[in-house]
From Swiss-Prot:
NCBIfam families: PRK00092.2-1. SUPFAM superfamilies: YhbC-like, C-terminal domain, YhbC-like, N-terminal domain. Keywords: Cytoplasm, Ribosome biogenesis. One of its GO terms (cellular component) is cytosol. It comes from the Bacteria. Its main location: cytoplasm. Signal peptide: none annotated. It holds the Pfam family DUF150_C. This is Ribosome maturation factor RimP. It is found in: Cytoplasm. One of its GO terms (biological process) is ribosomal small subunit assembly. Transmembrane segments: none annotated. The keyword Cytoplasm applies. The lineage of its organism: Bacteria, Pseudomonadati, Pseudomonadota, Betaproteobacteria, Burkholderiales. The gene is rimP.
């Protein structure tokens, strides 16, 4: 928990927000960042600035790592917080539940956002409209505690430039 607090505070000081922290084999610490206004994309210069700052801060705070990687969320960004689930309402996502609902854990569908409860309360319920096995549209209602992971489905336009 200290790790997340330290990194999040440093990112806020630099004008960024934390999306995700991952630890991988070989001592890799991967930090995913975004701009709080969501308007400006993360560039290599942003990643360099954060990497430089964290490479000084982490040793001072006794947070171990061998390699530090800073990145943007990408097209298939993770959807983690209640605010993310509300922000990306109407978009297509891949959602994996911790425990199966109706004999399945994995769903792809349109995120509905907050259905009931307060946004940041543990009893907040979100929705997902997906195509069932019978081809009919179904709605899944879930809380954040039931979600293992969720990612946006990338939308890529290959039309290119018109001459």
């Amino acid at each position: 928990m200290k790790e997340q607090q330290v990194i999040s505070a440093e990112l806020e000081n630099l004008g960024y927000s934390l999306v995700e922290i991952e630890r991988e084999a070989g001592g890799l610490l991967r930090v995913t960042i975004e701009n709080p206004d969501y308007e400006r994309l993360i560039t290599v210069l942003d990643c360099e600035k954060v990497s430089h700052q964290l490479s000084y801060t982490l040793p001072v705070e006794n947070i171990p790592y061998e390699r530090l990687e800073i990145s943007s969320p990408g097209l298939d960004r993770p959807v983690k917080s209640a605010a993310d689930f509300q922000r990306f309402a109407g978009m297509e996502v891949d959602l994996k539940l911790r425990v199966a609902a109706g004999n399945r854990k994995n769903f792809r569908g349109e995120l509905q956002g907050l259905l009931s409860g307060e946004l940041n309360s543990p009893d907040a319920k979100f929705g997902l409209v997906f195509e069932g096995a019978d081809g009919q549209s179904s709605q899944l209602e879930f809380s954040l505690a039931e979600v293992d992971k969720t990612r946006l489905v990338p939308v890529i336009d290959f039309k290119g430039r018109k001459s």
